[in-house]
């Protein structure tokens, strides 16, 4: 737990130096903190995050995505494709492992109601991209956001994050269900 606290402290210091986006979401059992750094004029986004579930364990990730507009019309459709390096520590299963899931995200903002957006992401690592005790990893997120301030959104979402392990232990659902969150852009 000291490692996680140190990681959060370092992340908060980095936010003040390089900040682009800080995302926080939670429900009664889980908390997720994510930082996104947008590399200027390259279309690359670098991100790091931590998901903690009070009973099921932790997920740490670092990722890279190529991001651009996927639409040519008035309505804005932003897409990002890439991957992540993921470390999982399942408290209930006693297992941990690494995975390299590939995937991406879509974010749709209709011009007529441009304060509202719908977003989703999907990441999957089959056994060939799993290392150690991990057999596969999957994460799906959907959310509806409202742009409260120019640089701040509030959202309601649903998330499913699961790690499957090679040994005879139950698969770990790190989070499943609804959450609320906010996204701050600097």
Question: Where are the regions that the model predicts?
Answer:
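Residues that define the transmembrane beta-barrel architecture of outer-membrane proteins
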Residues: 27-31, 42, 56-62, 75-77, ...
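Sequence/structural signature of outer-membrane beta-barrel proteins
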Residues: 31, 51-57, 69-71, 84-92, ...
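Outer-membrane beta-barrel "beta-signal"
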Residues: 146, 173-186
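Transmembrane beta-barrel strands of outer-membrane/channel proteins
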Residues: 24-28, 46-52, 64, 81-87, ...
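Cleavable N-terminal export/targeting peptides
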Residues: 1-21
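Outer-membrane beta-barrel architecture
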Residues: 34-36, 61-70, 103-107, 143, ...
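Repeated loop/turn-to-beta-strand initiation elements of outer-membrane beta-barrel proteins
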Residues: 41-46, 69-79, 112-118, 150-154
């Amino acid at each position: 737990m000291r490692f996680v606290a140190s990681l959060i402290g370092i992340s908060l210091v980095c936010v003040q130096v390089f900040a682009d986006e800080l995302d926080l979401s939670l429900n009664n059992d889980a908390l997720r903190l994510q930082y996104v750094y947008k590399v200027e004029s390259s279309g690359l986004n670098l991100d790091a995050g931590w998901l903690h579930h009070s009973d099921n364990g932790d997920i740490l990730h670092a990722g890279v995505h190529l991001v651009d507009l996927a639409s040519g019309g008035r309505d804005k459709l932003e897409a990002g494709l890439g991957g992540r390096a993921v470390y999982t520590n399942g408290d209930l299963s006693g297992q941990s492992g690494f995975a390299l899931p590939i995937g991406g995200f879509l974010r749709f903002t209709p011009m007529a109601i441009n304060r509202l957006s719908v977003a989703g992401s999907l990441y999957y690592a089959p056994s060939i991209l799993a290392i150690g005790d991990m057999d596969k990893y999957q994460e799906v997120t959907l959310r509806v956001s409202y742009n409260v301030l120019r640089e701040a959104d509030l959202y309601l979402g649903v998330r499913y994050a699961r790690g499957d392990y090679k040994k005879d232990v139950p698969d770990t659902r790190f989070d499943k269900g609804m959450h609320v969150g906010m996204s701050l852009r600097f």
